[in-house]
Amino acid sequence: MEPYAILYVTQEIEYLLKDSFLPKWELDGIKDLNTLWLERGRMACDTYAIGKIEQWSVRQLRAHRFLFISTKRKIRLKDCTISPDIFILKKELKEYDMKRFETLIGRRRVTLRKSFGNMLRAYAFQHVTVLHGSEAETLSYADPKRHVVKGQPKAAPMYDHPDRWWRDVDDGPTDKKLVSMLDYIIYSADEVYYVGCGDLKTLEQFASRDRKRFDRIKWICIDPIAPETSYANVKVVREKVVSARDLKHYLMRDEVERLLIWDVSADGLKGTIEWEKQRFKEDRNGENIAEALCADFALALIKHRIPEESDEYICRSSWLIPQPGAPITMYELRNLMRLDGYSHVERKHIPRAYARKIDAEVARRLVEEYHGEDVGRLLKRSLYEDIHIERADGLTDGDERTRADLFYLTNMRNVAFMHDVYRVVEKSFISTLWVSNRQNFTYDDVPVNRNFITLRFSKKNRRVLDGNGAILFLMWQHPKDFPKTMNYDPSWAENYAVIFYHALTSPVPDLSLCRFIGLRLMSSTLRINSDRAHQVTDILKKLGLDVSGHLFICLMSNSYVADLDWWFRMILEWSVKDREGKLAALSEAKAELIEWRDEKADEPWHIKNDLLAALFEFIYFAKHFDINERYVESWIQYLRNA
């Protein structure tokens, strides 16, 4: 069974649901945890929920995959007040019909996916050095002085490879041209020398957009018209730069990564031959100064105006790239030059700047293909990734530093190398595997069986959880770093298994371990579709013996990712306590439950032999899931030795 969502809507939205074909779940009559769990388990598709939820905590509702939809800015729960995951302005609600409402939900849920990914990256950033399979989101949160961001991003459009130019129908507008330029180029720079900075409005707009990145850079802004500024990290120099000597004496410390931005454009009579020559000279002068100071700068980004009267010309360049946010009438590229100065990032995939002949017609076509004020968002992202992500195949990279492998291992291109994928998971500090069989229109991931992951990867101090469980675990264990009020889509998160290192201080059955939602539904489904699935377990129970139904159905249904080391320790160490002992351990660990039967509280939930019986019975079925019996037998041995 796939992880379907509960779409909770507040009262003022309920009237829309009359036209929905999805089920509607009334919550008002539910009084206890177990009833909530049992009723939730009957739902085998996305379901709307209405009614009172103040008696439940946010983690309990997230465990049931609740998404909160409201026109209210805040929703009150048992333990906190949260912002809705999907907010609708009340004055706009009257314009919605069911189709528009559900379209909005679909679009907003896509944006919520990023929140899940960012939370996993935040945990990774705390513990690892190398991040594989990286995209723009990784760069945006990485510390270039501490983290090595590796991957194989799609090549950005550039002059050299017109055969690889691409367009995307999902593209849209981005920031203004120069703000976009700063956004994609400054990633790892300690010092930026901005020659031709103008009136500093570009810098101010970028500071307003991303103050954290702005503040970590020392800016040297050089332009005769530059005004004074109150920014402590900005030095203004009101001079012209006409030679390398003019710039050299402003270079400050050693062993820092420096970036040169050259955006010099003097006044002239537009359209004249003299103006064309002046523009050409200014751009070549920027290249010459960058080359003369090549030992001081890691990168230079030079203004590159395409001559109107020339078919071919010579420049010094690594890449000629289009400009996100530039008007389609602006026949100007940016010239990226990789130089020899110190850099935090390995950029061997970018050729060292060299003198080269440029075909002006190809350069103009590059402008016409990518410039325009209604496009540029994906171009900027692509440039950002292509310039700053170190090229490496995560499956073969020999870097032995602590690593993270998020959101790429189960891509279609790795399907022939699953042995290497599993080897990477074994050595990675945190990794993800796609486990869902639902249709995925966004990514080309191939699912891995949940029961295989459950049996293969769990061990002491290594957690194996679905993505929702991983987030709930981090909220439980690290509430300051991962507040429980954070917005994310729990059902989307459960499309992934997350395997990560984290010690377990207390083996209590916190709801992050596994929720087993729909377990009884899956058990009934197996029973009515097979004469063999329950045969042996039924006989054992008639003989007065017991089998862990949770464990058996978990493995047989292939619907759940569970941490067996934690689970078995919970049964052997916590479940044997009496009611008071159980509750005391839960209280001390600040854990929360998703199911609890008070009438059984003094009894063990199961004993070792119940777990062994479930594993022995599953061995018969393991071959149907292409699971080697040794992975089951290793857990049988684990229990025998416990």
UniProtKB/Swiss-Prot annotation:
Gene3D superfamilies in the cross-refs: Orbivirus VP4 core protein, C-terminal domain, Vaccinia Virus protein VP39
Gene Ontology CC, one term: viral outer capsid
Alphabetic keyword roster: Capsid protein, Outer capsid protein, Virion
Origin: domain of life: Viruses
CDD domains, per the entry: capping_2-OMTase_Orbivirus
InterPro entries: Orbi_VP4, Orbi_VP4_C, SAM-dependent_MTases_sf
Job of this protein: The VP4 protein is one of the five proteins (with VP1, VP3, VP6 and VP7) which form the inner capsid of the virus.
Protein name: Core protein VP4
Species of origin: African horse sickness virus (AHSV)
